[in-house]
């Protein structure tokens, strides 16, 4: 700042002020003279300044330190222990000695040595550090530091009488620690060489105290600022008492006070600078804490999800096992029901077959009763019965030669035995099924093979309770029946004389058949041409027996061969003997 704006002093005035002999002197600033530049330490005499000696004084405020030079300016002697009153009158915004003494000047904001409402005196700061070091083990173990700082505040209030909240204590300690770290790491950037005032206490708490470095150096820039603040724009009246202090000591004491204020201002500025770095470290800790909370939250949710998935998988497995057991039980029950149904169906067809066999036996007995001669059972229900039937047929064909009717019956049974024992009912059912499927056979005529149709016919015969027949046997049987039908129709068309014997196989008759119309047979055993055509129907044994009867002149055998008993069964008129056995003769094919 420009020096012309402040009161100017010369060397004589300064010496007179320093050597005042106990009288009150009023000094009026002069506008013509200035403080010389050598007063600031540039051109002083080469006298080594004594060590800094600070004299403690007591005021209405807290404890403070007054440099010796400033004390001398106040008019009091250090040896006599007299109190001095320094009155400075200012106009505008100037700063006097009173503002410097009560902490409102250069040293008011450094570390809180002032005694105001928001300031921390040195003794209170030392008390805070002592309590904090005493509770250091609790701070290291606790996660939440807030209750511990409340405990520090309570101890300071109860034991030492300082009223500070836990939050203020924590903020003060953080500022002290931040500046301590910067000082220890050499980042404080101090030029006066003064170490931090609370470095020893913090070093005992956080590290070794061997790094204490003190390098005395004067900061001329801040000293000039202090001297500049010492001046005011208006005239200043200073009332002093006499003093026996030398001029050199007074000037050096004043210079020492300026250095002390420089230390205070420097410490305060560095603490304010370090507060921003402390905020950064606090934000980093909060960020790390936030990341840890997020990680813990995700881990907790993942554990819950895995546990829920395990429970769900266990339930799903149990449900699948229960469903599988139910399915197996239902399948087993269905198998039992199906087996029972098949057994019931087999039993039904067995009863039906037994009923049909009983009916056939009744018919045979009726024929035996009417003819008065024994007949051979036409149906063979088992291989043993088939073998026995064939043997009986051979025996009867050899022994029974008395009449032609016996020989005709034998021939009929032999035909049935030679045709793998096809019964009359079985032949009728074969013809019925084949006739019902005639349209299907016509559709595939000239196309694909009809083997599957004959297999279907054989399966239907098995379902009706007959013996198992292959599709080839059914087809051959049908062709054999068809050939016989065609030949019989030819004989009917020729109107031959009726004969008592037939082809040995029951054929369904139509309206053109003379058996129903004229009660005549279309077959003649005496016709050699017809015998040759029906060689598959007749047997060589029956032909030999018939020829033997005719040759030997046995008229009864010849008559028996040429006599038909069908008119006898039909009876005279509208009555017939079939009805007495519950049978009814019909012209339809399926009866």
Swiss-Prot record:
Transmembrane segments: none annotated. Residues 118-177, 422-479 form the Myb-like domain. Residues 535-551 have a biased composition (Low complexity). Gene3D superfamilies: Homeodomain-like. GO terms for molecular function: DNA binding; DNA-binding transcription factor activity; kinase binding; protein homodimerization activity; transcription cis-regulatory region binding. Keywords: Developmental protein, DNA-binding, Growth regulation, Nucleus, Repeat, Transcription, Transcription regulation. One of its GO terms (biological process) is petal development. Confined to flowers, at low levels. Also present in 7-days-old seedlings. Barely detectable in other tissues such as young seedlings, roots, stems, leaves and siliques. Expressed in flower primordia, more precisely between newly arisen sepal primordia and also at the basal margins of developing sepals. It comes from the Eukaryota. Induction: Expression within the newly arising sepals is repressed via the PINOID auxin-response pathway. Residues 1-32, 380-410, 491-551 are annotated as: Disordered. Interacts with KIN10. PANTHER family: FI21293P1 (PTHR21654), TRIHELIX TRANSCRIPTION FACTOR PTL (PTHR21654:SF60). This is Trihelix transcription factor PTL. It comes from Arabidopsis thaliana (Mouse-ear cress).
């Amino acid at each position: 700042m420009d020096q012309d704006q402040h009161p100017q002093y010369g060397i004589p005035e300064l010496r007179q002020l320093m050597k005042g002999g106990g009288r009150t002197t009023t000094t009026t600033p002069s506008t013509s003279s200035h403080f010389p530049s050598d007063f600031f330490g540039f051109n002083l005499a080469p006298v080594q300044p004594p060590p800094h000696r600070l004299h403690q004084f007591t005021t209405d405020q807290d404890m403070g330190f007054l440099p010796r030079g400033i004390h001398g300016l106040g008019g009091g002697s250090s040896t006599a222990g007299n109190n001095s009153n320094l009155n400075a009158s200012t106009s505008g915004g100037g700063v006097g000695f009173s503002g410097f003494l009560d902490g409102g000047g250069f040293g008011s904001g450094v570390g809180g040595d002032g005694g105001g409402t928001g300031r921390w005196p040195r003794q209170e700061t030392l008390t805070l550090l002592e309590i904090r070091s005493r509770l250091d083990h609790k701070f290291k173990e606790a996660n939440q530091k807030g209750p511990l700082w409340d405990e520090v505040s309570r101890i300071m209030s109860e034991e030492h009488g300082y009223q500070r909240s836990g939050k203020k204590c924590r903020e003060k300690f953080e500022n002290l620690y931040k500046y301590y770290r910067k000082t220890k790491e050499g980042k404080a950037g101090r030029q006066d060489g003064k170490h931090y005032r609370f470095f020893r206490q913090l070093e005992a708490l956080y590290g070794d105290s061997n790094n204490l470095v003190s390098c005395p150096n004067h900061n001329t820039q801040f000293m000039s600022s202090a001297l500049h603040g010492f001046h005011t724009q208006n005239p200043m009246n200073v009332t002093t008492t006499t003093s026996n202090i030398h001029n050199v000591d007074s000037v050096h004491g004043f210079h020492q006070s300026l250095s002390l204020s420089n230390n205070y201002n420097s410490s305060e500025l560095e603490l304010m600078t370090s507060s921003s770095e402390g905020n950064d470290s606090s934000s980093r800790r909060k960020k790390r804490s936030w990341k840890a909370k997020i990680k813990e939250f995700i881990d907790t949710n993942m554990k819950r999800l895995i546990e829920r998935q395990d429970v769900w998988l266990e339930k799903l497995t149990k449900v699948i096992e229960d469903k599988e057991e139910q399915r197996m039980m239902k399948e087993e029950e269905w198998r039992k029901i199906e087996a029972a149904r098949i057994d019931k169906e087999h039993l039904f067809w067995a009863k039906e077959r037994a009923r049909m066999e009983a009916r056939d036996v009744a018919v045979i007995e009726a024929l035996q009763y009417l003819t008065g001669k024994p007949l051979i059972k036409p149906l063979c229900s088992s291989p043993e019965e088939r073998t026995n039937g064939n043997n009986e047929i051979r025996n009867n064909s050899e022994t029974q030669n008395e009449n032609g009717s016996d020989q005709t019956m034998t021939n009929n049974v032999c035909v049935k035995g030679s045709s793998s024992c096809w019964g009359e009912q079985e032949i009728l059912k074969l013809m019925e099924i084949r006739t019902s499927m005639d349209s299907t056979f016509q559709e595939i005529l000239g196309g694909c093979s009809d083997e599957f149709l004959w297999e279907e016919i054989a399966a239907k015969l098995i379902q009706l309770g007959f013996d198992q027949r292959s599709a080839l046997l059914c087809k051959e049987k049908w062709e054999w029946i068809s050939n016989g039908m065609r030949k019989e129709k030819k004989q009917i068309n020729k109107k031959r004389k009726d004969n008592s014997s037939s082809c040995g196989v029951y054929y369904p008759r139509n309206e053109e058949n003379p058996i129903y119309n004229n009660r005549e047979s279309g077959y003649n055993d005496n016709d050699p041409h017809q015998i040759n055509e029906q060689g598959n129907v007749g047997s060589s044994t029956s032909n030999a027996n018939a020829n033997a009867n005719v040759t030997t002149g046995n008229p009864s055998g010849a008559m028996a061969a040429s006599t038909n008993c069908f008119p006898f069964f039909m009876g005279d008129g509208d009555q017939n003997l079939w009805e007495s056995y519950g049978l009814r003769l019909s012209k339809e094919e399926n009866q």
